[in-house]
Amino acid sequence: MRNMLSESLVDNYKGRNELNIVRIYSGDDGESHFEDVEVEMENRGQVGRISELWCGKGVMFREVEGDYEIDFHNAPRRQLVVNLTGSVDIEIGDGTVRRLGPGSILLAEDTTGRGHISRAVDGEPRSCLFVPLD
């Protein structure tokens, strides 16, 4: 039996030709900014919709406790961050906060400048997958 979150993710992408991810990047002003990015998907019939190949350098898994808060920091490299369990609030310098839940994908590119804050949500631990990109 599928859970409600899985069903809502499937319903969100049903019949669409793109997948939405959140990008965080360093602006010319030295601050991090958010951008919503649509990843184009090609319909391949029975095998589903598939994007172009993104080249990665491996995979890292991470778990954090539900009380973490990491003050302003930069992404250590350009990478995809895929939330597996739990949620994270990401805050940028102007006070904007994005909440990323399970199944959310972040393209982290704010490797310079002030960076962003990451904090746990509702005391829940979180697990995620890092995919460093070329």
Report residues per predicted region.
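Short, conserved beta-strand element in jelly-roll/cupin
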Residues: 63-66, 73-90, 129-132
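A short hydrophobic beta-strand segment most commonly corresponding to one strand
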Residues: 105-111, 121-134
